[in-house]
């Protein structure tokens, strides 16, 4: 889990646009962010395997 202070800090509007860093909306993780879903790769995988993200399923070929 991310530090609570970092999560709160990222929710505030930053002074400059380049200072903004995307964070997972579920756990607050700053790395591995998937922009389309607003989640990090770990949370995305958990929710996708549970079937909670509509239109997403595990690929197989």
Swiss-Prot record:
KW RNA-binding (keyword) present: yes
Lineage, uppermost ranks: Bacteria, Bacillati, Chloroflexota, Dehalococcoidia, Dehalococcoidales
Cofactor note: Binds 1 zinc ion per subunit.
Described function: Binds 16S rRNA, required for the assembly of 30S particles and may also be responsible for determining the conformation of the 16S rRNA at the A site.
Entry binding sites for Zn(2+): 24, 27, 40, 43
Keywords associated with the record: Metal-binding, Ribonucleoprotein, Ribosomal protein, RNA-binding, rRNA-binding, Zinc
Family: Belongs to the universal ribosomal protein uS14 family. Zinc-binding uS14 subfamily.
Organism: Dehalococcoides mccartyi (strain ATCC BAA-2100 / JCM 16839 / KCTC 5957 / BAV1)
Cofactor dependency: Zn(2+)
Any single Gene Ontology cellular-component annotation: cytoplasm
A biological-process GO annotation: translation
Keyword Disulfide bond annotated: no
PANTHER family tied to this protein: 30S RIBOSOMAL PROTEIN S14 (PTHR19836), SMALL RIBOSOMAL SUBUNIT PROTEIN US14M (PTHR19836:SF19)
Record's protein name: Small ribosomal subunit protein uS14
Single GO term (MF): structural constituent of ribosome
Pfam families from the UniProt entry: Ribosomal_S14
InterPro entries given in the database record: Ribosomal_uS14, Ribosomal_uS14_bact, Ribosomal_uS14_CS, Ribosomal_uS14_sf
